Amino acid sequence: MDLITLGKAAKDAAFQLATASTAQKNKALAIIADELEANAADILAANSKDIELGRQAGLSEAMLDRLLLNESRLNGIANDVRNVISLTDPVGSEIDSKVLENGMQLSRRRVPLGVVGVIYEARPNVTIDIAALCLKTGNASILRGGKETFFSNMELVKVIQSALAKAGLPAASVQYIEKPDRELVTQLLKLDDYVDMIIPRGGAGLHKMCKENSTIPVIIGGFGISHIFVDETADLAKSVDVVENAKAQRPSACNALDTLLVHERIAEQFLPMLVAKLNGKVTFVVEPKAKAYMTKAEQVRDASEGDFDTEWLSYTLGVKVVADVQEAIDHMREHNASHSDAIMTNHLQNAELFINSAGSAAVYVNASTRFTDGAQFGLGAEVAVSTQKLHARGPMGLEELTSYKWVGKANYLSRA
């Protein structure tokens, strides 16, 4: 597979997409949604091949469930595409404008990024999600999914490209790297003449590989240690409920709670309440001060080096007692708090200190870390959750898939 040819085609398509009307882009999305449902039999047959190969390869039931498509899930994906149609198209909108002293009207106008390369693992719905969001924002995309969903992704991309042709848009607006050869990923990361941004969606290893090998700007995110600090002024009963939600609602999510920090003045009262709530569900990984108050915990072990740097993605929770909000903040800084962190408190000054000091992409006061999500934020959809500070931060919706250009309008004006 010649990635340079792929890149050139994507760049040409991006120039056409940049001038496509919202109506034309929405037409393509509507056709994609309809064609997903119309071609359900072929898509599900392809997915069955992936599932069977996954079983033969010894994939876990949890992983197989992530790969699985059925009629209900496929209808849900089609409806997600229809939801993207209903979202406001940011392309062409003015961010701000002003009239300069020389009479020039100067504005910043949103424009597509160009070509977005996305490297992702497992779930086939990501193929449609990314393609839909990129199309809505006038971006061409080059997709590289995991080998576990090869047949599913090939069928999905066929549907997308057919829909693009029917809508009068270039089929190369969405392209897929068919071969699972890892060397092609490395080549994609060097395709800076044609690709404007790389978005990895997967574990820390994938992000690290992209960051170290790419000559293209990379969006880093999707992982980081999530913390909750329970302050001495917090409502303890309500805090236990929030901690349970953050840890146990969906422990495999990147915004699930990893480490609980508890003020020493309420630890003796709060930690037994926590144990009573989560016993049998959660394994507690504890430092000595916390352990002293958790004698009734059924599943508990002493924390060892590296435990507080671990994104558990499971029913495991690190627990530590701290002296105050400042020690909690210091702990978070030391242990990669870059994704989602929260404080439970009724103390306004401590809340503001936490908000201003926490280095995470999303910070909450008296709310679960589980809210860091494009749909929950009212963005409608997300392409990734960025934990870096440049270009975009937190859930990346449609606006985050755009850049801007300066537009100056005048009456044959020359610079003095």
UniProtKB/Swiss-Prot annotation:
Pathway: Amino-acid biosynthesis; L-proline biosynthesis; L-glutamate 5-semialdehyde from L-glutamate: step 2/2. PANTHER family: DELTA-1-PYRROLINE-5-CARBOXYLATE SYNTHASE, GLUTAMATE SEMIALDEHYDE DEHYDROGENASE. It is found in: Cytoplasm. Keywords: Amino-acid biosynthesis, Cytoplasm, NADP, Oxidoreductase, Proline biosynthesis. GO terms for biological process: L-proline biosynthetic process. It catalyses: L-glutamate 5-semialdehyde + phosphate + NADP(+) = L-glutamyl 5-phosphate + NADPH + H(+). It comes from Vibrio vulnificus (strain YJ016). The lineage of its organism: Bacteria, Pseudomonadati, Pseudomonadota, Gammaproteobacteria, Vibrionales. Its EC number is 1.2.1.41. Catalyzes the NADPH-dependent reduction of L-glutamate 5-phosphate into L-glutamate 5-semialdehyde and phosphate. The product spontaneously undergoes cyclization to form 1-pyrroline-5-carboxylate. SUPFAM superfamilies: ALDH-like (SSF53720). Pfam families: Aldedh. This is Gamma-glutamyl phosphate reductase. InterPro entries: Ald_DH/histidinol_DH, Ald_DH_C, Ald_DH_N, Aldehyde_DH_dom, G-glutamylP_reductase_CS, Glu-5-SA_DH, GPR_dom. Belongs to the gamma-glutamyl phosphate reductase family. GO terms for cellular component: cytoplasm. Its main location: cytoplasm. Gene3D superfamilies: Aldehyde Dehydrogenase, Chain A, domain 1, Aldehyde Dehydrogenase, Chain A, domain 2. Transmembrane segments: none annotated. GO terms for molecular function: glutamate-5-semialdehyde dehydrogenase activity; NADP binding.
